[in-house]
């Protein structure tokens, strides 16, 4: 128990205790329950074990529960289960490990070297297997440190990573609110004097959620279904610990003695609103798998961490030299990718090893710049600083020409509602345009695109990032240059505004 508050922290029990000559105790079916400050329960059980008691005790005292707690020991064929609350009927996550040691004085749990199938396996190669409704995890070697005073995790380390699969990402990550209609607006209450007062605020949480960072290190590969979509040196996920989940009603034993949880005890999706059963269901998202070869480290974030995660906003980062992305025919290379779940915004940033952000799509559009921020809620992508873009343009006789545009002061790209199609682009500052028939300089350039042509039914490639066909070019400011006419004769241009509508005649 916590001596200051009286809160239950830890329970230990075993079906059988056998004293040994060296002062240790062999235990059968030992079980330890950790009571977390957020209401969750961690239960660690094993087939057998050997423990050292914190105080000298007789066998009778041990059997009667008066012999104190083990100070340290070792357990074999261990199962660790995470429950949402003490009365939960089933665990949310289950971890299986062949052998673990524990030390209640230092609150440390770790894998130990063991003989498996006649061979000595080092501690960092003992398999660690985790399964849950939406999660599968495989790695090797475990070191866990517990904060007994605060009732929370201090650190967790998997020595060698292998695989993490999230079968349904929408049930694990918080739901985004990128659509304005889904944003939460504080309720306002009218007072008697006609003024409007803000809604009353909830009472402070006496069990605040802890912000953690999970760091997957070395040779990171991300797959969506069977398709590889990203590679990086490191994957970082900033998130909050789970909120307290209270049971709606106490569980009642049935005549057989088994615990029956009330229907409301079944864990619901914590991030997705419950919809009527008649509501149309979207196709299930593909599972996401992360593979890596180095360590997985989980630890609390520093209190002064800038832009920390919130309950609705987890932060996912890919860091590499460089980070490479590929999906639906589109590719990107950058030094760092930052994704925020609340608004589904994406930032592609440079690094010392990858100073330029490069993007290409399956339709021939390419972009080079120093930084890109995609804001799905506003339907725009902002390219910072100077850059270069290349766009396919319809040419004579059905051929495709390339228009190259350079700029100095940034570019704003307009996206379709689903963020998959480029509809427009505005280039600012010392803009230059180069095309087989056009050579121009301007202060600003606006480009408008036709929607991409529909693909045949057999072509399942997604339109993500497609720019369609350039329909109009509008140059403003100090516009100068030349344009070739149909006879390839140059015509000099000097104006404040120039608009070119691009298309083909019936002859192509």
Language-model segment annotations:
Residues 1-508:
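Mature-chain termini and adjacent capping regions
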